[in-house]
Amino acid sequence: MNITIITCVLPWRLNSGGAQAQFNMIDRLRKKHHITIIFPEDSQNKMAYAKELQQKWPDVKLKPYRIWRQMLYPRFLKDKAERAFRLIFTPNDERFKVQRALKHYGIYPSYGFMQFVNKTIKEENTDIVQVEFYPCLWLVRKLPNNVRKVFIHHELRYKKNERTVMAYHPTEAELKWMNALKREELEDLDRYDTIVTLTEQDKEYLQQEGVKKPIMVSPAAINTEMTPFVPWNNRLAFVGSYMHHPNLEGIDWYINEVMPLLHDAPLLEITGKGWPDKYSGERVKLLGFVENLHDAISGSIMIVPILSGSGMRMKILEAAAMSMPIITTTVGVEGLKFIHGKSCIIADSPKDFAASIEKLAQDKEMCQMIGEEANKVFKENYSKDILAEVRDQVYAL
């Protein structure tokens, strides 16, 4: 089958959950299907990375929409300049934070880009067009009628908006805009032939909102190898990029509200790109992007203090694969098959989160029990081969 994937996140390098989710799935599917990937070149999707990926996947066609072509579109330059100005001069303004959260899609609807997309679809004799991530959702309006269209919804944007924006006391106008974006998201989803969510919970949310098209659940796979439990090394671990707002929000919550409640706070090591030096301190260490995640965090307690967003938390699966004990919020583990008190600990208040850290720090047997149970859940539900079979069923419809 010929599958053309349109994405705003190049599945290489593996420095974000979105990149990893795509890479591990495509790495399996390319052995059974002819895959073409269309992506916009930008500061994250560098041509150097595309060349590295092409060497790994000689059987996959990579089709970059070059940055110079995007710069010919006036709105592209206007938005980039305005955003840079606001980031420099008003980075902490609450209204700017709300505006960034309520950004209208993200891939610019230029005539040139759609020509490029539809020409590629025709040249590759495409059977299925697979669109990934919310910024690309609207493309369905411009795609040919004679191909099947599948959308992979990594994170329900309207659900993320609801959880994020309400913390900033939105104005009436902002609430009106948020609801308009929600309606547009749901309407565009119903333009696809099939919708894929990463969790059962996200599927239920969409069904409750009245989405009519078929919705299938196909969790994302990770590349972390399964390893046995390692005794606690007196450290906490967090994995995630600074550029993803729920990560930033969660770490701010932990540092400002949870850590002061700990009698002797363990060292927190943050793995992920982009974290500014201001987060580094006596009890917080920034590791940046690491090539070998296992070597960096094995033996730690994984914390997932996520307060907003939706979708699937890859960091929980990574911890479970390594038999690490996990402390998370309800939002952090939403849609995953981990159970409080058995394969993870769920704590939603600063007091409960701090108490959970201290409990595991003092109870080595509980640490091991939760880590091993988490690994069991991972093995039975989230291994790469199992998840690739599930995704292949989407194409067989």
Question: Whereabouts are the PLM-identified features?
Answer:
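Conserved acidic donor-binding segment of nucleotide-sugar-dependent glycosyltransferases
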Residues: 344-351, 359-365
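Acidic donor-binding loop of glycosyltransferase active sites
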Residues: 193, 297-311, 322-325
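Short hydrophobic beta-strand element within catalytic cores of glycosyltransferases
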Residues: 315-319, 325-329
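Conserved catalytic-core segment of nucleotide-activated headgroup transferases in glycan assembly
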Residues: 217-298
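Donor nucleotide-sugar binding/catalytic pocket of nucleotide-sugar-dependent glycosyltransferases
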Residues: 150, 158, 175-178, 186-227
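Conserved nucleotide-sugar donor-binding subdomain of glycosyltransferases
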Residues: 78-128, 134-137, 170-191
